[in-house]
Amino acid sequence: MKISKTQLTPAKCALDLGDGSERGLYVNQDYILRKLGRPHRGINIMYCYYPFDKEWPQRVSEACKDTNISFAWDYPYDDYFPYRGGIDGNHDGEPFTCMRDIRKHGQEVVLTLTCDPNVTDEQIEAIAKDLVPYGRMMLRLNHEATGDWFSFTKRASYKQVADFYVRFQRILKKIAPNVSTILCIGGLEPGSDKIEKEAEFAEAVKETDIWSVDQYLSLNWGWPYEVALKDNSKHKRSNTKEVNKPMLISEFNADGDVTGPFDQIATVKEFCEYIKADSENWLSGFTFYQFRDDGRLGLEITDPNNSDVGVEQPILGAYKEIMNDDFFKQGIEVKGDAELPVTLRWGSSEDSEGIAIDVDLEKNPVFAEAYFEGSLADANLMMEINGQWFYKAPGVKFVDFMPAFFDGKISGPKTVKLNIFAPPATGENDPSQGEDWLTNYYYEIKELPRLRFEFEPVM
């Protein structure tokens, strides 16, 4: 079989996906990959850290379940799941189980963390040490920082919130330079060319790696305490063309509570077409919020009878079309011939080196299978064929590629490439692999999988 060296390259506009928040539980990456057919650049998970509060480390809505609450952010601290790392932390629990799951599946961790601005340097150092093994991840610290709903904005002035961001950033960079920081603040002040709270956040803007805003084309921000009816006030809807400044959008959607399921599709697709048509390419990426939602902000909504069950929404099919648009998906470039053994490098979903196997097809297959024997049995692999991605976990010896040929049928003879990449098998980079271990992971592939492609039924 002919094999080639390949390189993952960035999309023109990257897609990240929210997975778990105050509005929904984390959904495992095996399920999401099966539903959507391809990975994202990154997966955003949302946690909080308020170690001085008497309710800590409980999730605050559980600690205060007998308290009369009329707004989602009226609790003593933010109702995200608690970040259980830090000093004397437990790396066997959340968010680390989720972070490892995300990276095994060839995606970057985007950790959103709301944090008490009074935490000590020692506590920040401990969090930074937690993040060292997770490669080229992103940290969105104290997002929507120019708002007034999160607990950290009620414990400090905006200048103090900004100064805390700078302090955290500087400590983080000394310990975990592999982590890129995201400063998520407001956009331009209405009728002005100045950034909201520009004076207070000037130093934070200079220090951060990435600047972003959150933008909902429609949102019922009274959820879950108010239904978005025409006569109610706690919902808004924006014209998509008002979002026209260079930015990373860290939370994006149109709320089905406001638009309904069909206008939600139209609004999101209109915005994506606008992004594609813009000659300045002002948007580097956006995070769709989110996969499964307790309200109507999800590709699925949570079944109220069973939170392990998601109810697919019409937006999911439209979102799959967006994911498969060349503008929004990473590229795979062929870099010349290869011979075994080959060392594969995993840097990120936008910068990794793999191999491609040429597969000659007579027509659409009836069976399309791969068997992983010998040293490959313990490999952790992400694979792509005919536009669809598949995951092979360590210990798995068989993968069925036929789903790639259900919708993407081959009408005649064709050569397709089976692309193979090797993200970290444990979800963490290996410090024994050399000086660049913070940002790269290596795996030597010594043999190829045994392929079975058949074009007629057995009987």
Positions of predicted regions on the chain:
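Aromatic-lined carbohydrate-recognition surfaces of secreted/lumenal glycan-active proteins
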Residues: Y165, Q169-E196, N244-D257, L283-D293
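Glycoside hydrolase catalytic-domain groove-lining segments
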Residues: D78, Y216-T259
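Active-site groove signature of glycoside hydrolases
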Residues: A128-Y158, T181-L188
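N-terminal carbohydrate-binding/catalytic regions of secreted carbohydrate-active enzymes
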Residues: D16-P133, D294, S375
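Aromatic- and acid-rich polysaccharide-binding/catalytic face
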Residues: I45-C48, L111, K197-A228, L248, ...
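Beta-strand-rich ligand-recognition modules
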Residues: A377-L448
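Substrate-binding cleft of secreted/luminal carbohydrate-active enzymes
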Residues: K2-I32, Y47-Y50, P246-E350, F421-D436, ...
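A short beta-strand element within beta-rich, extracytoplasmic domains
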Residues: G336-S348, S352-L381, V416-I420
